[in-house]
From Swiss-Prot:
Disulfide topology: none
GN (gene name): rpsN
Key words of the record: Ribonucleoprotein, Ribosomal protein, RNA-binding, rRNA-binding
Gene Ontology CC: one annotated term: cytoplasm
Oligomeric form and interacting partners: Part of the 30S ribosomal subunit. Contacts proteins S3 and S10.
One term of GO molecular function: rRNA binding
Family: Belongs to the universal ribosomal protein uS14 family.
Biological function: Binds 16S rRNA, required for the assembly of 30S particles and may also be responsible for determining the conformation of the 16S rRNA at the A site.
Protein name: Small ribosomal subunit protein uS14
Superkingdom field: Bacteria
Stored Pfam families: Ribosomal_S14
Source taxonomy: Bacteria, Pseudomonadati, Pseudomonadota, Alphaproteobacteria, Rickettsiales
Keyword Transmembrane helix: no
GO BP terms in the entry: translation
């Protein structure tokens, strides 16, 4: 299981990202718009760079909700492959069946 501080850091990044998403999108739209003057686009670039680094969605890591494992995490179920197998074998995930042929 991951350290609690790492899990909390990721949750903090998720909250910051969701809070500042609209502001980042507005600034990015200004930066990409060719009809706006170069000076205004540069000022938007400066404002974007002054936003917290953790407000970018790239810094969010998909982690297992149960164990906090960063790798092998299924997005659909939000759990790792190990937990998915355990929960699936005892019937805790609806619609998930063991395959046989």
């Amino acid at each position: 299981m991951s350290r609690k501080s790492v899990i909390q850091r990721n949750l903090k990044r998720i909250s910051i990202c969701s809070r500042l998403k609209s502001k980042r999108d507005e600034l990015k739209a200004i930066i990409k718009d060719q009809s706006i003057s170069m000076n205004d686009r540069f000022l938007a670039q400066v404002k974007l760079s002054k936003l917290p680094r953790d407000s970018s969605y790239i810094r969010i890591r998909n982690r297992c909700l149960v164990t906090g494992r960063p790798r092998g995490c299924y997005r659909k179920f939000k759990v790792s492959r190990i937990v998915l197998r355990q929960l699936g074998s005892i019937g805790q995930i609806p619609g998930l069946t063991k395959s046989s042929w």
